[in-house]
């Protein structure tokens, strides 16, 4: 790796470049090793349940590493952090943020699910206003462009520099340039995700030449192999020392050769805190340089007795506060319930609850991890949050029959059961769809916004203030009131 002049580095280390120094060692501390601990796609999984191991176990492992003499820990999160669990969603991510502050995270990359409540909701946590909750760490993205200003959004940083006295570490954040399509179009309409690669090279060079960073990491909410290869291709000061991936919920601890000929770590750690990445960099104080990083993914299931009692108490208090709502028993499974059956049932629930001719959801909105559901299971509000963790609204419009036929062929759309396709013929309530007739169509907003065939050709478009999850809950309550079981 690049060798820095010791005298120059020590002079630069006296200057703070957006760093948090309170918990970092002074210049007299001898650091032999830096461990970079990373989680990605946490999705608000604070509790230990359903095969997820919880924030208390993650925090225990981080603190265990922090106690090792001669070693420092850099704690990072690669996005999709807040959205996805009852305890996190109910507070718009604030509960997760409080736990992360306690764990002393150093930086977080913005992921596609940070847009689910509008990006502005999440950015409130880095706006400097303590009254709405504030992160003790920055949110990073060098390639999200606000169309109104043609710059990165206010309160977002391109990178963070963490100062350890003997050396500085730069972390560059980015989001996959193709991930706009994974966000409801209305939530991302004011933003562009540009190709991050050139900017990462520029920032890496700036971090080394101007900020005195010996180590530079690229942390992306992305797992594009072509992007990884291009980022790794930089040499000289523009080279990075590790690439952190996210988004696909996969698990790997690979290496890739950078433009300087070094084998650098390339990692991702699954989802929901099931794994935690650890990248070890050994520091040579005489040469003021790092050896090549070595990556390892901790399987958190191997630490059943690991618990940070303070975090456990925090999470218990959070869950207890919402327990009267989340633990309400709203139905009982009348048979074995699969994901596909819930997709069909949910489309029917929207059709029943909204004045329309037909309804649809996207199958990806129902999460496979919530299944199986066995006959006799008591279904709570919390269980519906597991099944449908996203705060999707219903949209409604008028669609011409000729356009509706194309809509009915969308691959991952699940339509209400009053829709039937026989060969090349389309039926609604047993009647043939007529090309020139207008039909009222209700649809989950993600699918509605994504499909130009709907968004571009629909008329009289309405955004109904109805969450799909709330429609599911109310329909289940009605079944219970009528003495019926779910999908009996």
Model-found features: residue ranges?
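Acidic, metal/ion-coordinating pockets
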Residues: 25-301, 341-349, 398, 462-466
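Sec-dependent signal peptide recognition
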Residues: 2-9
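Bacterial signal peptide processing site
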Residues: 20-22
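C-terminal motif of bacterial Sec signal peptides marking the signal peptidase cleavage site
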Residues: 15-18
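Catalytic centers of hydrolytic enzymes
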Residues: 26-33, 44-47, 59, 67, ...
